[in-house]
Swiss-Prot record:
Alphabetical list of NCBIfam families matching this protein: PRK00132.1
Keyword Ribosomal protein on entry: yes
Pfam (any one): Ribosomal_S9
Lineage, broadest ranks: Bacteria, Bacillati, Bacillota, Bacilli, Lactobacillales
GO biological process, one term: translation
Name of the molecule in the record: Small ribosomal subunit protein uS9
Annotated coiled-coil segments of the chain: none
Family: Belongs to the universal ribosomal protein uS9 family.
Amino acid sequence: MAQAQYAGTGRRKNAVARVRLVPGTGKITVNKKDVEEYIPHADLRLVINQPFAVTSTEGSYDVFVNVVGGGYAGQSGAIRHGIARALLEVDPDFRDALKRAGLLTRDARMVERKKPGLKKARKASQFSKR
């Protein structure tokens, strides 16, 4: 019989992560690379492991991720969101804990667009009264 697989899609900023959970040893693979190799920042790797910590399932699932768009922070947030959604498929009872930790909510904050006549989104050249 085929092994159980659980899927979830996560989004954050401009990053989209497609996540698959397979019962295993806790190995995380991102775009066919080990997570330590793909995401160099330890604090961002902690962000990725948050859903497992909240549901006390660390080391229970191997994670396979395909992520596109954004930078390290956006991709880490998208992976976290995808893992949380996939864990819901594993056990719907996780919903309460994941919701309380805020892991099921799509972070809607996006980069504000640059406006014409300004240097950045809100930065204007210095105002001179006289």
